[in-house]
Swiss-Prot record:
GO biological-process terms attached to the record: translation
Domain of life per record: Bacteria
Name listed for the protein in its UniProt record: Large ribosomal subunit protein bL17
Keyword annotations from UniProtKB, A to Z: Ribonucleoprotein, Ribosomal protein
Organism per entry: Chromobacterium violaceum (strain ATCC 12472 / DSM 30191 / JCM 1249 / CCUG 213 / NBRC 12614 / NCIMB 9131 / NCTC 9757 / MK)
Length: 131
């Protein structure tokens, strides 16, 4: 039975998977749009949305939690100053996943991951980790 299998392993060790998702969440919060594979995008949403929810309540404890999860001061500042204010009235659903075709080398399904209500001048960053 499939019960209690909560996340995808993505063919990586635990430390590699957690580091990869942390780096992808940092890239998403920094650039506000990234391109990656569809399974990675679905796991990324589970990491990024709670971070944005933390940013909506600006307390010292939440800043420390956000820094613990991102390990990047610039991301924490943007999370609490820019993104927290932008999503103050939205109750979840901060990340949009759009199917983006298939990768040329291995035909892997790709996805464009973006923050909703983002400014239109943000440019997509390609994920070249598997190429």
């Amino acid at each position: 039975m499939r019960h209690r299998y909560s996340n995808r392993k993505l063919n990586r060790t635990t430390s590699h998977r957690l580091a990869m998702l942390r780096n992808m969440a940092n890239s998403l919060l920094k650039h506000e749009v990234i391109v990656t594979t569809l399974p990675k995008a679905k796991e990324l949403r589970r990491v990024a949305e709670p971070l944005i929810t933390l940013g909506k309540k600006p307390s010292l404890a939440n800043r420390r939690l956000a820094f613990d999860r991102t390990r990047d001061r610039e991301i924490v500042v943007k999370l609490f100053d820019v993104l927290g204010a932008r999503y103050a009235t939205r109750n979840g659903g901060y990340v949009r996943i759009l199917k983006y075709g298939f990768r040329k080398g291995d035909n892997a399904p790709m996805a464009l991951v973006e923050l909703v209500d983002r400014p239109e001048d943000a440019v997509a960053v390609e994920d070249n980790s598997a190429e």
